[in-house]
From Swiss-Prot:
GO terms for cellular component: cytoplasm. The gene is groES. GO terms for biological process: chaperone cofactor-dependent protein refolding. InterPro entries: Chaperonin_GroES, Chaperonin_GroES_sf, Chaprnonin_Cpn10_CS, GroES-like_sf. The keyword RNA-binding does not apply. CDD domains: cpn10. This is Co-chaperonin GroES. Keywords: Chaperone, Cytoplasm. GO terms for molecular function: ATP binding; metal ion binding; protein folding chaperone; protein-folding chaperone binding; unfolded protein binding. Pfam families: Cpn10. It is found in: Cytoplasm. It comes from Pelobacter propionicus (strain DSM 2379 / NBRC 103807 / OttBd1). Together with the chaperonin GroEL, plays an essential role in assisting protein folding. The GroEL-GroES system forms a nano-cage that allows encapsulation of the non-native substrate proteins and provides a physical environment optimized to promote and accelerate protein folding. GroES binds to the apical surface of the GroEL ring, thereby capping the opening of the GroEL channel.
Length: 95
């Protein structure tokens, strides 16, 4: 199934964080937090203004992004977990 987000919504695939600390300790699954970085896999056309114009999004498919801990709505597509969020939920693009 292929999804095309509407307006200023973005579909993000979480990027898993390291399971080992800098000191060499492994973090158990129960202690890990959900990652706050991901990759944009689909994006809408842009945000509609009050006068009907469409402002293009700053992020594009393939961008690595940082987002807030509680950002987005979890969705499952073809057995894979994604986050659907608005562009405003994106904190930064990792370059």
């Amino acid at each position: 199934m292929k999804l095309r987000p509407l307006h200023d919504r973005i579909l993000v695939k979480r990027v898993e964080e390291e399971t080992k600390t800098a000191g060499g300790l492994f973090i158990p699954e129960t202690a890990k937090e959900k990652p706050q970085r991901g990759e944009v896999v689909a994006a809408g056309n842009g945000k509609k203004t009050e006068d009907g114009k469409v402002l293009p999004l700053d992020v594009k498919v393939g961008d690595k992004v940082l987002f807030g801990k509680y950002s987005g709505t979890e969705v499952k597509v073809d057995g894979e977990d994604f986050l659907m969020m608005r562009e405003d939920d994106i904190l930064a693009v990792v370059e």
